[in-house]
């Protein structure tokens, strides 16, 4: 069986229920989690840097999720903020490509820190899209 360009990858799905709720789920396509991974809560005001070694930011919104609490930069694999925005990092080996330069008016964010940055700074999907 030929697998094509993608030999492994996580999946996610979301749906609206008849009673008006929004549900989201995902799988994790690795046989183990990084040592130190845990369910965590990050309160408003938690410091982080969207680029390793870069200038610091603070969370506007509290976040909870599963992740790795690196000393200066927490990483969330999936999470939810106190405004109801939720998301997850999905991994597709060799699928993503990143530009060499920075777009005018945009801030650099390294991929492992993107979910935390969006959940920590955005209250809605529309805000997250503008942030990208």
Task: Please place each PLM-identified region on the residue numbering.
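A contiguous strand-loop segment
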Residues: 2-106
